[in-house]
Structure formats: structure tokens, C-alpha cells
């Protein structure tokens, strides 16, 4: 057989692909993982049964030098770790095949002490933070002023500006991720049996939540909290009046464009950045900062962490705690309340 190393390597990749297919992982996830393994193979110019821990260290240094985010490095490490795990699993024959054909066997080269996941609990940038209440209000005021300006000037785009303003408010009022927001359909507006006066604006059924482990998108219902009931009139106006003026026809998307299509994620990012800059807010604030703001503000309102975790769809409570960044005013209120209870308790004991 010509170049047996190449044929065995390709067979390994094909076998790993089939294993992931059988687990129901998304095709895009599988392609991304295979691409990482091929890239590592090309970088080392070695076949898997020749890989070493030092190869991973050098590869990591290379991608970090190219200013890759820590989350990207972690994804690379995870892909390599899972591939090596597959090769060294005794349920498969790769160890026996390699020993028989090449007198070497694959080994796990991604270990706890040379991977990002072991070193870093939080991989976000230190400059990322939630918006304060004042910044949220400033952002929404600027978005609303866009609508008024376009209406008063007689220029086109007022309906689109109204849609954009309500979309940003929805991201904040429900703590949504970007994809979760743009993939909403009109049918995803739901009632809250406890607050019938809100009609179908009491909850959102999120069908495109972040997938776990490369599987299908998860689903959850996010309840509107009373502190954000200001969201209802604007949403009612969009759904019952403004949206129909885009002539969506049979299109089920909640957020439609002038061309009768669903809004894109890229558009939402760009529009947030434009409105943020118009509002003279810090450039390090991103659309995802609104989701961080939601978690922080619900915590300051006094909601239980478990409730907040369910609302935002976090698998682990630790992720929710990372999102939270309570204000100094909130900390002072909590401290004042604790001191008051302590003083009252001491006076009662006298």
C-alpha cells in the first residue's frame, strides 16, 4: 500500500466522523473538529501515533501568537482531546492497528496542565461588562430618537428603526443571545397564566438556544418579569401594527426586513454598534453585554440565582455567576440591610 500512514490517518478521521454522526452532533460541529485535527496534523507534520505533549504546547503557542481568543484555543484543545480519546478507546482497534503496522500507538496529548480549560475559569475579555441602568436607558432613548427623527424628516426607514429599537429591548428584557433573538417567530410569543392581563406578551418560547456538546439547539421558555413590563406596549405596537406594514405574507419570522426576509445576526450586531456609538457609550460594550446586564439586574432585583439560570438557559450555575456584576449601589444596599438587621438584633438583646 502506497503511503500507509496517510491511509490510516484518513481512516481515523472517517471513523471519528461516523462516531460523531451516530451521536447526533451537528454537521457544522463535526466539520469544525475535523478541521482542527487536520490543522494540527499539518502543523506538526506527524501522524497521530507520533504526536507528543510538546507538539500541543508548540501548536498552542502558535495560535496564541496569532491573537486567537482563549475560547478559540479551548475549542482547539477540546477537539484534539476528543480525537485522541477516540483513538485510545479500547472499544476501537486503532491502538492494535498502529502497534501492528507502525510499532507505535496513539496517546492522549491534551492533558489538564497544558490546556486552556484547566487554567482559566472565565475566558471572556476583562473589558467586557454589563451596561448600567443609565446606559441601558441611554441606549434605548437613542434608538427611539432615531424613529422620531426619521418620521419628522419624512425620510424612509422609520419602520426599520422602530423594529431595531424593539429588537434591542427584547434582547435585554429576556436576556437573549443574538441567534435566539433573530430566530424568534410570531408564534413564539406566549401567555403567562399568572399574568393574564399581559396577553400573549408574558413569555417567549426560545427554540434556537445554544446547543450543548454539538447537539441540536436547546429550547426553553423565558418569562417576562414584572420589572420589564414596559416592554409590552412597544412589542404590541410592533406585532399588531408595524410588522404588517412590511407585508411579511406567510413569513413567520418576528423580525422581518424590507425585502421580506428574516433579519441576520450580522445586521443586529452592526445596528447595536451604530446606536451605541450614537449614544456615546463605551465601544467595549457589545450586544452580548445586554444579556450580561439582564443577569446582573435580575440579581439586583432580588431574583434567585436558580431562576435566573433557568431564564438565560445556562447549564451550569457557575456560568450565570460569571455573567453577574452587581453595582456598588446594590452592594451598599445589601450591606446597609445587613447592618440594620445586626443593630436591631443587638438592641433587641439588651
Predicted regions, residues:
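Conserved catalytic core of the tyrosine transesterase superfamily
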Residues: 1-350
